[in-house]
C-alpha cells in the first residue's frame, strides 16, 4: 500500500494505474489482487484504475500484441487504456466524496518508521539464491504459466475459426470501422467470457483483417468493463451493487468514444 499511495487524489490514481500495467496477471487473476488492495485500504477509485489498466497490459501480452499488431499500435492501446483507467478512477473517488457511492471502510495504518525500499532490500538480502531456489522458481513459473498458455491457445483457436468461416470481406463488413461494426464488437465482447489472453488474437484480427483499430481496442476494453465475473467480485468485495454496476456505466462510454475516434481518424 505504501507504493500504491494512501492519497485519494490524482497521485494515488496514477500509482494504481501504473501498478496495473506493470503487474503481469490475466484479467481474472488480477481480480483477487484488486480485492486484496481494497481490503488493505485502497480507495475504490484506485481499485478501479488498477483493474481497468491491468488485464491485457501484462508484459507477456504486450509482447504478443507487438508481434500481432506492431509496436506503435500496442503502445497506443496501452496509453489509451491508462487514460480511461485514470479518468474512471478519479470519477469514482469524486462520487464517493459526494456520497453517491459508499467509501472504503477498510484502513490499515503503516508504522511511521516503515520504509518500503529498506524493508524490501532487507528481504532480498535474507533470500538465499541457491540452485534449488532458482530451480523451484523456474518450475513454479512453468507450472503457473499453463493457465495463461491455455487461454492464448483458446484465443488462437477462436481466431482460426473466424478466419475459416468468415471471408475477409464478410469479416470486414460485420466488424468493420462503422458504428454498426463497433456495436457488434462490443456485443460479442460482452457476451464472451474469455480471459484477456484469449481475446488478444481476436482483437488483433479486428485491426489487421477488418481494418478497424477502434473495434480491436473496444474488444479488449469492453471485455474488461462488462465482464460479469469482475462485476460480481466487485460486488462481493465492496458489498455494493451500485459500485459494481458503475464500472461499466463509467468505462464503456469512454471506450466507445475512443474506439470511434480511432476508427475515424486512424
Model-derived features with residue positions:
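Membrane-interfacial helix-loop connectors
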Residues: 20-78, 163-243, 265
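Alpha-helix capping and helix-coil boundary motifs
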Residues: 8-11, 125-130, 240
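Membrane-interfacial helix-loop-helix
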Residues: 1-22, 168-174
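Selected transmembrane alpha-helices and immediately adjacent juxtamembrane segments
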Residues: 2, 75-186, 208, 245-266
Amino acid at each position: 500500500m505504501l507504493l500504491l499511495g494512501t492519497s485519494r487524489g490524482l497521485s494515488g490514481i496514477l500509482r494504481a494505474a501504473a501498478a496495473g500495467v506493470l503487474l503481469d496477471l490475466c484479467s481474472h487473476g488480477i481480480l483477487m489482487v484488486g480485492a486484496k488492495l481494497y481490503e488493505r485500504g485502497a480507495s475504490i477509485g484506485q481499485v478501479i484504475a488498477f483493474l481497468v489498466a491491468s488485464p491485457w497490459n501484462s508484459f507477456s501480452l504486450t509482447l504478443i500484441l507487438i508481434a500481432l499488431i506492431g509496436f506503435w499500435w500496442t503502445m497506443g492501446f496501452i496509453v489509451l487504456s491508462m487514460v480511461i483507467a485514470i479518468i474512471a478512477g478519479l470519477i469514482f473517488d469524486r462520487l464517493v466524496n459526494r456520497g453517491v457511492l459508499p467509501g472504503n471502510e477498510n484502513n490499515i495504518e503503516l508504522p511511521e518508521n516503515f520504509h518500503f525500499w529498506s524493508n524490501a532490500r532487507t528481504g532480498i538480502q535474507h533470500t538465499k539464491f541457491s540452485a534449488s531456489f532458482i530451480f523451484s522458481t523456474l518450475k513454479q513459473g512453468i507450472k503457473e504459466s499453463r493457465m495463461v498458455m491455455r487461454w492464448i491457445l483458446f484465443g488462437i483457436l477462436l481466431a482460426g475459426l473466424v478466419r475459416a468461416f468468415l471471408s475477409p470481406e464478410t469479416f470486414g463488413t460485420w466488424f468493420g470501422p462503422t458504428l454498426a461494426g463497433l456495436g457488434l464488437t462490443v456485443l460479442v465482447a460482452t457476451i464472451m467470457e474469455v480471459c484477456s489472453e484469449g481475446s488478444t488474437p481476436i482483437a488483433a484480427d479486428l485491426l489487421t483483417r477488418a481494418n478497424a483499430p477502434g473495434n480491436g481496442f473496444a474488444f479488449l476494453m469492453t471485455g474488461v468493463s462488462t465482464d460479469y465475473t469482475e462485476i460480481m467480485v466487485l460486488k462481493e468485495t465492496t458489498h455494493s451493487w451500485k459500485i459494481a454496476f458503475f464500472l461499466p456505466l463509467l468505462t464503456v462510454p469512454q471506450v466507445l468514444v475512443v474506439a470511434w475516434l480511432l476508427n475515424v481518424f486512424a
